[in-house]
């Protein structure tokens, strides 16, 4: 059952005309804004005068079975307002009890992000009013969070790395969800689903070390990878288990003082974070260049219009009237507990990349692709240990198999071709028993008939011609049939070698060994 909040006016013809007028005004306003945006684009020379300063606040839902302060299910997609209890919705006399698994996950995340974990942290009440926060306050942490002083390394455009600091990681509970559309009376009512109230969160606050939208994108990408490797969250942005707010200001390059910041909310993808920051940086520079003053405020990102718009003035910490949560004691973590969690950390993405580059002789690009998911990295390594050439396995996974899966919107675990099939294909290529073209044809059959590669290979049994005399015979026939091209080649048009290779490959029905064929064609044409 959804709870509704009435927010409309009486009906009737006057009301309809009023609302129609509002819609027309809104449409005109959008058109005017778009024209203004197009007219006030900031030139590259002006952009180069300023330095953006960006900090990100990332809220991450933890994958606990139950909520942070009660025993209600922590489950996305349940019927509205079914996973709630007196603690979730703040009924008088209901007391919170801290979820130990949430503490473990927050500690793991902190250590994976190179943070210093506090042995003593304190929960606090963050007081504010919003319809989907029925208690009127949120249990969070303020001046004594569970962890501080972390960092993540991100790649730079110049090919190096940059360290982005993490100010703090703290624990808190999530609020409910306001639903503003999708109902027949959405024009006059907002519906509330309180299932999300009490969902365990960590908020990860970066230092203002980020200088470009691209750096912000890389920071979020690396952060998500690390959290997924530790299995503390599924980081599903569509379901709201990873949400990002961006704080951004601009200042003249070399200026010691920070500019006035704006907070950008409602950004539900890493791509939109980058686009929102690009827009907001230009908006603030445009204001300053026009002699105006940037206002400290919270702004919402509108992806369809490609712009931010003002939501409210930006709150300061004192606006929330933080005070220690009286119903929860301080959180005490022993050195032994912290050491135990550190020992439980898996090999993290960056360390794994470096090892795999060295161990399997992979390119940096391939190593990044294969380690972007812990599960896919595990699958690759298991296959690489049994294959004759691990690099062939990597090439097949990334190019041949990955390309097909991406086109179909499938994950690796949904592929009709198993990892054993990938290893067989790699070994057949390595031994020269099939060509790349033959493998592609077999893969096409696998996807068309939803069969694994070993079964398709056994049935089709393609053979590669590796007999030198057989290939030379085909080359002689092609040369005899194309005297004009032979003359052009010998006159200096060496690119025609590809023509002869193609003709022989066609004559062999794709079965000639490519490396041997190229060698013999060149030898014959040069003789």
Give residue ranges: language-model regions.
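N-terminal mitochondrial targeting presequence
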Residues: 1-5, 16-39
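Core structural elements
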Residues: 240-252, 358-379, 391-407, 448, ...
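Extended, non-catalytic structural segments that build the interaction scaffolds
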Residues: 337-344, 351, 381-388, 422-434
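Residue-level detector of well-ordered alpha-helical segments, enriched
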Residues: 366, 379, 389-397, 421, ...
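M16/insulysin-pitrilysin zinc metalloprotease superfamily fold
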Residues: 386-387, 393, 401-416, 424-429, ...
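Short, amphipathic C-terminal "tail helix"
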Residues: 495-527
């Amino acid at each position: 059952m959804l709870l509704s909040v009435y927010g409309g006016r009486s009906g009737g013809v006057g009301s309809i005309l009023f609302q129609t007028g509002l819609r027309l005004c809104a449409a005109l306003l959008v058109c005017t804004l778009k024209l203004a945006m197009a007219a006030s684009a900031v030139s590259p020379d002006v952009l180069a005068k300023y330095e953006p300063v960006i900090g990100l606040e990332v809220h991450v839902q933890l994958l606990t079975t139950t909520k942070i302060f009660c025993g209600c299910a922590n489950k996305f997609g349940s019927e509205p307002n079914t996973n709630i209890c007196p603690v979730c919705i703040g009924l008088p006399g209901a007391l919170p009890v801290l979820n130990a698994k949430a503490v473990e996950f927050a500690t793991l995340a902190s250590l994976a992000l190179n943070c210093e974990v506090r042995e003593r942290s304190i929960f606090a009440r963050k007081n504010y009013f919003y319809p989907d926060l029925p208690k009127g306050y949120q249990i969070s942490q303020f001046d004594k969070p569970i962890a501080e002083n972390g960092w993540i390394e991100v790649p730079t455009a110049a090919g190096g790395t940059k360290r982005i600091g993490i100010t703090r990681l703290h624990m808190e509970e999530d609020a409910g969800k306001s639903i503003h559309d999708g109902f027949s009376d959405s024009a006059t009512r907002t519906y509330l689903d309180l299932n999300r109230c009490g969902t365990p969160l960590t908020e990860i606050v970066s230092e203002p070390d980020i200088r470009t939208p691209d750096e912000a994108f890389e920071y979020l990408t690396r952060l998500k990878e690390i959290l997924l490797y530790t299995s503390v969250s599924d980081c599903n942005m569509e379901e709201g288990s990873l949400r990002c707010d961006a704080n951004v200001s601009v200042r003249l390059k070399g200026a010691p003082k920070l500019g006035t910041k704006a907070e950008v909310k409602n950004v539900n993808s890493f791509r939109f974070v980058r686009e929102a920051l690009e827009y907001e940086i230009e908006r603030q520079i445009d204001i300053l260049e026009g002699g105006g003053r940037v206002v400290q405020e919270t702004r919402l990102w509108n992806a369809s219009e490609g712009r931010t718009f003002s939501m409210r003035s930006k709150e300061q910490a004192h606006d929330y009237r933080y005070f220690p949560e009286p119903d929860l004691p301080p959180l005490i973590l022993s050195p032994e507990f912290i050491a135990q969690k550190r020992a439980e950390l898996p090999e993290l993405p960056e360390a794994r990349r470096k090892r795999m580059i060295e161990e399997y002789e992979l390119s940096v690009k391939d190593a990044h692709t294969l380690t972007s998911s812990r599960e896919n990295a595990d699958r690759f390594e298991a296959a690489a240990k049994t294959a004759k050439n691990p690099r062939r396995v990597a090439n097949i996974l990334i190019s041949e198999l990955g390309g097909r899966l991406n086109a179909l919107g499938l994950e690796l675990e949904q592929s009709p071709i198993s990892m054993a099939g990938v290893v067989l294909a790699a070994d057949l290529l390595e031994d020269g028993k099939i060509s790349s073209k033959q493998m592609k044809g077999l893969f096409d059959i696998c996807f068309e008939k939803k069969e694994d590669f070993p079964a398709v290979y056994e049935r089709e049994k393609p053979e590669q011609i590796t007999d030198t005399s057989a290939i030379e015979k085909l080359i002689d026939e092609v040369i005899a049939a194309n005297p004009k091209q032979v003359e052009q080649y010998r006159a200096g048009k060496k690119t025609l070698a590809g023509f002869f290779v193609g003709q022989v490959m066609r004559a062999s029905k794709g079965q000639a060994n490519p490396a041997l064929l190229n060698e013999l064609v060149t030898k014959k044409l040069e003789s």
